[in-house]
Amino acid sequence: MTQTKIIPIFPLDLVLFPRQELPLRIFEPRYKQLVDDCMLGDGQFGVCLIDQSNLVNGWNAPKATGTIAKITKCEDVEMDGLQLHIETVGRNKFQIKKIIPPSLAPPENYDPYTVEGHNIISELHEKFGTGEKMYIQAEVELIPEIDDDISLEKWQNLVSLWKNKIVTQALPQVVELHSLDHVLEKYYLTTDMPTVDYVYSLSALGAKDPNDLQPILESNTIEQLLYNVEKLMTVK
């Protein structure tokens, strides 16, 4: 039987890949509670792309496949403690098996960017009980890593597709190929020994929308991964 566990979920407008670094500024009370709980536990939560077609108790719902984020640093932004800055790094991918809704629905006209919004949520949280979780949780199943190697030939093909996509999308402006080589150098993507992580990073460079990266994250075999990245890089 496959083992599952319950983790906090942070829906975001981005896709986090394994071993990628992700800095976040935390200001909403529900996500400050999430970070506080993580710091008291194993320092891990799930990052999922927002599912624009669904809500969970009135809040943005997560896509079903995400990545565990491990908090590596946490500090207050200001002395008032209203904002936190955390640094995280991606770990395993996971599949959501069951959503556990948050205790609170968003209040009418709730604005998380204001002090008033913070006060309203805090008052509601005290009313419902401070032991209740304001954030989404989920029962998740961890997804095994892709262990297969990527041949240099396949990697060079992906790089060529990426370059062609950038050059074509820039028209009528001319993009010199050597400038794209500099971009690859900047992101440490010049290699003779490519790995899955290189493919993830190149995909991020080739995507205009985070939704374009979700199929990449959902790829669980090397064949699926290469197919979806080639599809992403192909100019339509």
Q: Where do the language-model regions lie?
A:
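N-terminal low-complexity, acidic/polar interaction/targeting segments
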Residues: M1-K236
